[in-house]
Amino acid sequence: MKRVLLLQVMLMLFVTGCAQSPIGEFDFADGVVQHAVPADEMSWKACPPNLPSGCEIAVLEGDPRAPGLFTVRFRLSEDFVMPPHTHPRDERVTVLQGQMAVAFGANGTRDGAKEFGAGDYYVNARGAIHTVWASKSSEIQITGVGPWEAHFID
């Protein structure tokens, strides 16, 4: 009876310990209690060459190329189109300004796309083929778990 109880307690502690993940914990330096990125101090850069032209990126937290939590912002020109693609992990998007449209499927069309405006939030499921359009100059914020990848559909 004691062995069964001990095993149950150990199993409960193991499961509880596994359910707690440090993925959302920020790596603060000693004595630092907040990470802030004021809008006027964001470091905007051209998007990587594997992404379509017409976008800039600012990394707010983490590294989207490495394992772990990250948050980035994208500035998109009004004619920006992200062709059909997938991501290996869920993609969490907040539209900060402008207008975005998302269509699903390898042949998704702009006419069949769902529209999102400033203040809207959506999550695209991992593995779902989708195309993204900016209807006007836009800024979006993406939070996810890296490494973040976009696999384009030929």
Predicted regions mapped to residue ranges:
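Short acidic-glycine-tyrosine-enriched beta hairpin
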Residues: 106-127
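Short beta-strand His + acidic residue motifs that chelate non-heme Fe in jelly-roll/DSBH
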Residues: 82-84, 102-103, 124-125, 129-135
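A short, N-terminal "cap"/entry segment at the start of jelly-roll beta-barrel domains
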Residues: 21-70, 114
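Glycine- and acidic-residue-biased ligand/ion/polar-headgroup-sensing regions
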Residues: 77-80, 86-107
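Bacterial N-terminal signal peptides that target proteins for export
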Residues: 1-7
